[in-house]
Amino acid sequence: MAKESMKAREVKREKTVAKYAEKRKALLEAGDYEGLQRLPKNASPVRLHNRCKLTGRPRGYIRQFGISRVTFREMANNGLIPGVKKASW
């Protein structure tokens, strides 16, 4: 499990990106690159990293469900994800 501080840091980045999205878009369209440099570093969407919503694990992220592969497997085996079942052929 990821440290709580890492999860909180990622949430803070998401809020910062959302806060400056419109301003960032306007600066890009105007070609004001110096204005872009004055924005906070965390206002850039490139700095965001997908993390598991339950454990905060940064790797093995499944976008469709928003959780890591490990958490997905546990939940699917326990029948906690509707419509997902183990494949057999």
From Swiss-Prot:
<comment type="similarity">
    <text>Belongs to the universal ribosomal protein uS14 family.</text>
</comment>
<dbReference type="Pfam" id="PF00253">
    <property type="entry name" value="Ribosomal_S14"/>
</dbReference>
<dbReference type="InterPro" id="IPR043140">
    <property type="entry name" value="Ribosomal_uS14_sf"/>
</dbReference>
<dbReference type="GO" id="GO:0019843">
    <property type="term" value="F:rRNA binding"/>
</dbReference>
<dbReference type="GO" id="GO:0005737">
    <property type="term" value="C:cytoplasm"/>
</dbReference>
<keyword id="KW-0699">rRNA-binding</keyword>
<dbReference type="InterPro" id="IPR018271">
    <property type="entry name" value="Ribosomal_uS14_CS"/>
</dbReference>
<dbReference type="InterPro" id="IPR001209">
    <property type="entry name" value="Ribosomal_uS14"/>
</dbReference>
<comment type="subunit">
    <text>Part of the 30S ribosomal subunit. Contacts proteins S3 and S10.</text>
</comment>
<comment type="function">
    <text>Binds 16S rRNA, required for the assembly of 30S particles and may also be responsible for determining the conformation of the 16S rRNA at the A site.</text>
</comment>
<dbReference type="InterPro" id="IPR023036">
    <property type="entry name" value="Ribosomal_uS14_bac/plastid"/>
</dbReference>
<dbReference type="GO" id="GO:0015935">
    <property type="term" value="C:small ribosomal subunit"/>
</dbReference>
<keyword id="KW-0689">Ribosomal protein</keyword>
<dbReference type="GO" id="GO:0006412">
    <property type="term" value="P:translation"/>
</dbReference>
<keyword id="KW-0694">RNA-binding</keyword>
<protein>
    <recommendedName>
        <fullName>Small ribosomal subunit protein uS14</fullName>
    </recommendedName>
</protein>
<keyword id="KW-0687">Ribonucleoprotein</keyword>
<dbReference type="GO" id="GO:0003735">
    <property type="term" value="F:structural constituent of ribosome"/>
</dbReference>
